[in-house]
UniProtKB/Swiss-Prot annotation:
Higher taxonomy: Eukaryota, Fungi, Dikarya, Ascomycota, Pezizomycotina
Binding site for Zn(2+): 303, 307
Residues that make up the propeptide removed upon maturation: 17-177
Signal peptide segment: 1-16
Function statement: Secreted metalloproteinase that allows assimilation of proteinaceous substrates. Shows high activities on basic nuclear substrates such as histone and protamine.
Source organism: Colletotrichum graminicola (strain M1.001 / M2 / FGSC 10212)
Cofactor remark from the record: Binds 1 zinc ion per subunit.
GO annotation, cellular component aspect: extracellular region
Protein name listed in UniProt: Neutral protease 2 homolog MGG_10927
Annotated compartments: Secreted
GO biological process: proteolysis
Entry keyword annotation includes Transmembrane: no
Disulfide links within the chain: 181-253, 260-278
Pfam families given in the database record: Peptidase_M35 (PF02102)
Length: 351
């Protein structure tokens, strides 16, 4: 990992498009996508249940930040997402982070898929969105659980030149030069990176030869293939967290991408190999916590590391925390940032 004082910023569902019909049939949230113009998308969310729902917006298609709102496929292959991957706090949230959708209410948002996906080749694409919303009780800001959702698939034809212009205009707004990571923020970040290395080293050993019960608790498998895959991810993190002057990633201590919205602890832009620690990281988090499944600075660094494509290129699937980890399939756990994070944290905390 390298600290940087300036940079020009850019701001799998392998195979065929896969829409989870079970989620669509059982969720109180109905999500319908519509194509707008060349590469625009309208997401229409309807609460089909009989009670109001208070949805956590951050990191979802309701978020105005450059997060992964949709997945885009061309000829059955997923097009890389070039925006931010977030680490979200599940405590200390404010009302601004939520959207209440009344029973029977419909809520619409619009965005452009070309801003964070390279659609310059043009041609036919399929667009979907699926995952989970965190939610709170209507009179609270404490996360109460998750609600899955899955949209329809929209098939549309893209004009590559128009899409390239949209992308170029969006990225031009994201070009910033920033000097940061000094003083106490640098100290906190350096210490967290060092702790991340120790966490990953212990996790790598546990993945390779540790108890079967821990592997199945977090990854739902303890086969040799699963152990090797997980151990490799942690070994990659050991290497990346082993230096603050070399490696594939760059670390920032100020919000160079403008993505530190409510509840965001840190974020990563995998396409550009940089990570940002938000004010919440410095002002609200302990360096380390021995409470099982707690969030802290050391695990935040590890979480963000897994998002790097050279490490693993994980997703969040819209969910964080132990209960969400337990709800995923084995295949999803292998590509879920918080699964790796909580596996490593459980060893540190002796869970």
């Amino acid at each position: 990992m390298k600290f940087s004082i300036g940079v020009s910023l850019l701001a799998t569902l392998a195979g065929a498009v896969n829409v989870d019909m079970a989620k669509r049939d059982t969720s109180p949230l109905n999500v319908k996508l519509e194509a707008l113009g060349n590469s625009g998308v309208k997401a229409v969310l309807t609460n089909t249940g009989d009670s109001d729902i208070k949805l956590f917006k951050t990191g979802t298609f309701l978020d105005k930040s450059p997060v992964e709102k949709v997945e885009v496929f061309a000829a059955g292959s997923k097009i890389d997402f070039d925006g931010v991957r977030l680490q979200i706090s599940t405590t200390g949230l404010t009302e601004e982070a939520f959207q209440i959708v009344a029973a029977g209410e419909t809520f619409e948002v619009e965005f452009d898929a070309a801003e964070l996906h390279d659609l310059s080749k043009g041609g036919a694409v399929d667009i979907v969105t699926q995952g989970s919303f965190l939610y709170a009780d209507v009179d609270s800001t404490e996360i109460a659980g998750t609600i899955p959702f899955s949209s329809n698939s929209v098939h549309t034809e893209i004009n590559g030149d128009e899409a390239a212009s949209v992308r170029a205009a969006f990225l031009a707004k994201r070009t910033i030069v920033q000097s940061d990571c000094t003083g106490t923020r640098r100290t906190a970040t350096v210490n967290a990176i060092s702790r991340c290395r120790a966490l990953a080293a212990a996790a790598s050993q546990a993945a390779a030869s540790g108890p079967v019960a821990r592997m199945t608790e977090y990854f739902k498998s303890s086969t040799t293939a699963t152990r090797n895959s997980v151990a490799t991810v942690f070994r990659n993190i050991v290497s990346e967290c082993g230096s603050t002057t070399s490696g594939v990633s760059r670390q920032y201590c100020t919000d160079v991408y403008g993505a530190c919205s409510n509840g965001v602890i840190a974020y990563t832009v995998p396409a550009q190999n940089y990570m940002v620690n938000c004010p919440y990281f410095f002002n609200n988090m302990a360096a380390a916590s021995s409470t099982c499944h707690a969030q802290d600075q050391q695990t935040t660094i590890l979480h963000e590391m897994t998002h790097l494509r050279q490490i693993k290129g994980t997703s969040d699937y819209g969910g964080y925390g132990y209960n969400f980890v337990r709800s995923l399939s084995a295949a999803q756990n292998l590509n879920h940032a918080d699964t790796y994070t909580l596996f490593a944290q459980s060893i540190y905390a002796g869970c």
